Amino acid sequence: MSASKIPLFKMKGLLLFLSLVKMSLAVPAFPQQPGAQGMAPPGMASLSLETMRQLGSLQGLNALSQYSRLGFGKALNSLWLHGLLPPHNSFPWIGPREHETQQYEYSLPVHPPPLPSQPSLQPHQPGLKPFLQPTAATGVQVTPQKPGPHPPMHPGQLPLQEGELIAPDEPQVAPSENPPTPEVPIMDFADPQFPTVFQIAHSLSRGPMAHNKVPTFYPGMFYMSYGANQLNAPARIGFMSSEEMPGERGSPMAYGTLFPGYGGFRQTLRGLNQNSPKGGDFTVEVDSPVSVTKGPEKGEGPEGSPLQEASPDKGENPALLSQMAPGAHAGLLAFPNDHIPNMARGPAGQRLLGVTPAAADPLITPELAEVYETYGADVTTPLGDGEATMDITMSPDTQQPPMPGNKVHQPQVHNAWRFQEP
């Protein structure tokens, strides 16, 4: 009986041992490294998304901050995407996200390349032909289409697109092409260039409308593109309309709005406080000629401006406001009833008369001084409210009620610190 029991106990022990081995293999006491056997080695490439999120949200200091432009870290990712944080110096190739769909206000010297989805825009600009270089591009685009069924279709388009000598005749030629426009898909149906021909004819039919719109392209403003927070770049001055004012996207002053202790290198090294537009682009609206021509020497500003409403006898305490720290920003530490007067006066509550601090006068560049003297006390100049432009807590609805007399200049103040949606 003992001889028959021993193999049974051995079999039970073997089964228990095998089941224990199987369980130890199934439930890993030592978890494997993330990354499959034949896949990437355990390292950065095999981190899971959850691990990246945990690494990215370590109390605002993320271990993957240099990759947060690429979408790994979550803590500083929104700041990076909005251009509040400068790109890392160790990764200079990670530039600012200049989307192709970014809306520019088209001006004379600067033209972004047209989108591939908008091939009809180049022939669509008849008034811009004598000024711009895309005329040669349009001529090159149309030349391969001339041998096709194009000349019997459009008798006026060949001399129209061939050179700029016929450019003054475009408003006369374009209305004559309105009847043949529906026939373009019929004639060029089998042509591989049919969509381009149809779009050219369609844009030619809309030629007079675009020709009438040409003066709106040059209202006297110019656009200067810049990378986010190029700290070594000089202060740039651009004139844009109030619809296109994106605010200071990557300036250290805007970053100082979220973190009041951070003043930026330019301000601390040069001794300038927050009236300096260095470190970001400096745009002045030129919508109303009254606001541009009227400077600090010609009065407080345009009629009904917040500067006149923000007099010290209106209940404001200038002594209390002047006691603010120089690093205190108007968007963060202003009293709730003083939002508009404080923004119009500057970060410390003083009126922007001289406009630069006395200590900063020998250090300031002549262009910067000229801008200060010309546009110092104007509402449309984001000098003192450069920090407040980036303040997320303020909304345009909270700012409109305190200024009842500013119906003319209210849209400019309203749009001066709104981001342009891409």
UniProtKB/Swiss-Prot annotation:
Residues 1-26 form the signal peptide. One of its GO terms (molecular function) is growth factor activity. Keywords: Biomineralization, Extracellular matrix, Glycoprotein, Hydroxylation, Phosphoprotein, Secreted, Signal. InterPro entries: Amelin (IPR007798). Ameloblast-specific. Pfam families: Amelin. Involved in the mineralization and structural organization of enamel. This is Ameloblastin. It comes from Rattus norvegicus (Rat). The gene is Ambn.
